[in-house]
Amino acid sequence: MAWPWRRRRWRWRRRRPRWRRWRRRRTWRRRPRRAVRRRRVRRRGRGWRRLYRRYRRRRGRRTYKKKPVLTQWQPTVRRRCFIIGYMPLIICGENLTSKNYASHADDFVKDGPFGGGMTTMQFSLRILYDEFLRFLNIWTHSNQDLDLARYHGFKLTLYRHPTVDFIVIIRNSPPFEDTELTGPNTHPGMLMLRHKKILVPSLRTRPSRRHKITVRIGPPKLFEDKWYSQTDICDVILATVYATACDLQYPFGSPLTENYCISFQVLGSAYNNLISNTLNPNEEQQDIKSAIYNNVNAYLTRITESHMANLISKAPPKQVLKSSDGSLQTDHNDTQFGGNPYNTNQFTTTTVNKIIQGAQNYLTTIKTHLQPNNSAINPNTQWHLEYHAGIYSAPFLSAGRLNPEIKGLYTDITYNPMMDKGTGNKIWCDSLTKADMKYTEGRSKYLIENLPLWAAVWGYLDYCTKTSGDAAFHYNYRVTLISPYTSPMLFNPQDPTKGFVPYSLNFGLGKMPGGKGYVPLRMRANWYPYFFHQQKVLEAIGMSGPFTYRSDEKKAVLTSRYKFKFTWGGNPVSHQVVRNPCKGTGGASASRKPRSVQVTDPKYNTPEITTHTWDIRRGWFGKRFIDRVQQQQASPELLADPPKRPRKEIKGLTEADQEAEKDSGLRLRQVQPWMSSQETQSEQESAPEEQTVEQQLRNQLHTQQLLGFQLRSLMYQVQQTHRNSFIHPLLLPRA
């Protein structure tokens, strides 16, 4: 009989699952032991050891230096407040990928797509209060009677779209300005090359993952953690968000297309000297006839019949006959063999004059039907801009030609985005009154060069509109391109400054952008290429770049949730509210209704009009407090008009700001006392003709105003520094 304590113990073993195969057991790898740097010792022989000096043992407790206690004044009342809300960072309508959503967030669109596929958005306390007025966020605590504030950062949660991918970049370091390179750097192909970016893949691109991405952003880099007045930090830019829609599954072209090259049309050389919309056609009638109307091959399009059926006469039908040697006869009207179906003998005499007269009749009819009568339309001087028979009408610029080998008044361009190196590319805007297509320093505006075309056109219209301050910019300017990376090249080696004017396919077909066939009467009287009819070309060029979203959905939205953390502080006076206990608000459930938080506009929550504990003496307001409140202006209670541009949009340098900077630099350079007489003499010699006395007085007045503004700004900064509430100027938006 074996003793039970000597029996071999049963050892537990892991068994194979009954209906599954063996799987390797996951073992957590232990972190390697940190190597200890040992002291190098001297080896001695046996029987020898190192002698140590004997020290007397100290009695008592060791004393340490006292740490200095740094104290900072804190307000009596401190309340933590979270501002939580939801906001669409991007709402991208169909075929609006290259537009800036932040610039069009407050638009009123009756019909058609809305928004844009990119955004450059900023956050500030004023913007958060504006969102509160729109019932888009909540404040967990009121800021009423608490005039101080501290900012601690925010959390941004991005929710993934089912089918559309996005790229987001968040910045909290200045400068916070929109420049000519902001749009190109927001292109998906450029953002994918950035180191610090946030990819928001769609549920289709990356399934079985969390449906949201959370990011923690701290205060701005130049922002000090201390108490500020809410008025001072009301306009401080807390963070900026740059986002764009993209395609992470098919970055280099959709699988539904044959290739990633695009084609568009540009005006031919016949329009080089006829591009101005203020051209008098009666004075330049001979040039217009010889360049446009007398060109018989220009009428060989599929739209000529619908536009000029009653203005142009056809030749009698002739057959293509073959001679005995197999050659074709030269006198025929079959366009497949280079013929012309129209009566070519009458073009220089009867037909051209009939077309011009028809254009004048159309303008007279348009002027009659416009109520009230529009005196700006003159049929005698604007007949060349008429919709049906003008020099930019569909019979001359439509892409569908009866014989593609017979060239018209335009040029077909093919663009390969993968061949674009950027060097030599130029894009700029010219006024419609400019008489040529050349780049002229001073007259040509908003130049972007040495960038790929697919990046240069990204957000270009919104940048130009923002910088110019003209809401009708797309009606007053045209876009001109230079690019040696197209086929044929949009570059003239004999004249490197000459540009080319592109136009959309719908404009060439006589349609509105988007393909609508009805053209308003006012546009029929002024039918010529400008930015409004060039947007789709720039959209197509931008969408040809890598990682670009190609408008597969009617509307794509990037939804976000933000949570800003503030601390309100102050020394308010306790208000005792006494209600009538005998008069209720109606019903037993009145106290169960949710109470709304009273939020005050941070712009007017100033220390000057806020009541503090030290403003009351023996139950009465002090004289200083009464005088201080009387000097302040009352806050407007009436509803103000909405801002001209969205507040969430990042501001840019306007033309006035750029000119002011140039003038300030020039004038400061002129008044520098350390400049040598030789430099001053050289500048005077290079200056233009002598200015008049009136111009000199105006320049001196402008210089004095500029110096006064700079001195006032300096004194304000000194005062803010003395109050320990100085804010770095780069964190403030431009006025």
UniProtKB/Swiss-Prot annotation:
GO terms for cellular component: T=1 icosahedral viral capsid. Residues 649-666 have a biased composition (Basic and acidic residues). Keywords: Capsid protein, T=1 icosahedral capsid protein, Virion. The keyword S-adenosyl-L-methionine does not apply. Coiled coil: none annotated. Residues 676-685 have a biased composition (Low complexity). It comes from the Viruses. It is found in: Virion. Residues 577-604, 632-695 are annotated as: Disordered. The keyword Hydrolase does not apply. Belongs to the anelloviridae capsid protein family. Self assemble to form an icosahedral capsid. This is Capsid protein. It comes from Torque teno virus (isolate Chimpanzee/Japan/Pt-TTV6/2000) (TTV). The lineage of its organism: Viruses, Viruses incertae sedis, Anelloviridae, Alphatorquevirus, Alphatorquevirus homin4.
